[in-house]
Amino acid sequence: MPLALEGKKAIVAEVSEAAQDALSVVVADSRGVAVSAMTELRKQARENGVQVRVVRNTLARRALEGTPWECLNETFSGPTLLAFSYEHPGAAARLFKEFAKNEKDFEVKALAYEGEFIPASELDRLATLPTRDEAIAKLMSVMKEASAGKLVRTLAALRDQKQEEAA
């Protein structure tokens, strides 16, 4: 069913606004995926701070003009599902990666992060980014290990000094 011009303008404005605030964007093709599975994907997306949207290709191209995501324009062919990550740059990629494991018809076309085009073959590059909490936990463990190592070296130096004094 054709959209009226005002409806198209509204869609372009909504998608453009969503793109301005996004940390990353993932483009996928959901042909052949059951409606119930797509509903579950949308639910999981909302829980993870990801906006999922099906947009006509010409409207998507117009909406992404002048944004860092313009590099994705070449991937808009066939049904296009856009996912905008707002809380964590890898959230949409991680979500789509997990979803694609269970849905053989679901295909990630491409993604973009900080204006850089990333082909679908490199999905893991973004999907494996640690979350903020994971990054803090890793940093804390490294700092904890470093301080323990420093203590061991200090005790070893103290032991060596005592042995030299005794000799």
From Swiss-Prot:
Q: Which NCBIfam families match?
A: PRK00099.1-1 (NF000955)
Its job: Forms part of the ribosomal stalk, playing a central role in the interaction of the ribosome with GTP-bound translation factors.
Gene3D superfamilies hit by this protein:
3.30.70.1730, 6.10.250.2350
Q: Which InterPro entries match?
A: Ribosomal_uL10, Ribosomal_uL10-like_sf, Ribosomal_uL10_bac, Ribosomal_uL10_bac_type
Q: Which gene encodes it?
A: rplJ
Gene Ontology BP annotations: translation
Q: Which organism is it from?
A: Chromohalobacter salexigens (strain ATCC BAA-138 / DSM 3043 / CIP 106854 / NCIMB 13768 / 1H11)
Q: Which taxonomic lineage does the organism of this UniProt entry have?
A: Bacteria, Pseudomonadati, Pseudomonadota, Gammaproteobacteria, Oceanospirillales
Organism domain of life:
Bacteria
The record's GO CC annotations read: ribonucleoprotein complex; ribosome
Output this protein's name. Large ribosomal subunit protein uL10
UniProt keyword terms in alphabetical order: Ribonucleoprotein, Ribosomal protein, RNA-binding, rRNA-binding
